[in-house]
């Protein structure tokens, strides 16, 4: 059984969902240590998006989420509007919306092969937004040519409680090493 379980992104998840995950973990392993992890989101240049119309994407497609870090970054940055790209999507991207109807007002991630990049480029250029917020780990601006700036939303793991991950690792190693 696990010694430690990390529940990540607790700062953006619903409290009830985090509690349910915690209950499921302790039901299976009552002695497990649980560490809450956070995912602070930062825009490379928040002033570029403030009070502007933005397109969010490419971002989450699988996993049942209707939005991801880029959407959260947009709402926190006080953008004027998040443009729904569905009306501007080329057929390849429109097919993704049909396959994953849970996707909200975001441009879905579908891959980075040449045809997929071309579909992404055309859809972005068609969408009447001032700027794109991209939360994908890839540097999208280096792969496609678009008629609006691309601002990256970045996130990483952060601890928010004591004991922290290092403390738990020391405890674990002390318990198993002679």
Model regions: which residues?
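Phosphate/Mg2+-binding loops and adjacent switch elements
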Residues: 1-32, 36
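P-loop NTP-binding site
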Residues: 32-33, 38, 42-178
């Amino acid at each position: 059984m696990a010694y430690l379980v990390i529940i990540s992104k607790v700062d953006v998840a619903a409290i009830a969902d985090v509690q349910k995950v915690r209950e499921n973990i302790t039901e299976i392993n009552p002695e497990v240590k649980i560490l809450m992890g956070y995912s602070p989101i930062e825009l490379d240049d928040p002033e570029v998006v403030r009070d502007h119309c933005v397109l969010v994407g490419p971002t989450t497609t699988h996993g049942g989420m209707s939005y991801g870090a880029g959407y959260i970054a947009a709402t926190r940055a006080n953008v004027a509007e998040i443009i729904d790209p569905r009306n501007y999507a080329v057929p390849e991207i429109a097919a993704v919306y049909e396959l994953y109807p849970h996707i909200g007002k975001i441009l879905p991630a579908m891959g980075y092969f040449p045809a997929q990049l071309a579909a992404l480029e055309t859809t972005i250029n068609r969408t009447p937004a001032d700027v794109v917020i991209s939360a994908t780990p890839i540097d999208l601006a280096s792969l496609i040519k678009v008629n609006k700036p691309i601002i990256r939303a970045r996130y990483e793991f952060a601890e928010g409680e004591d004991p922290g991950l290092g403390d738990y690792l020391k405890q674990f190693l002390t318990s198993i090493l002679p």
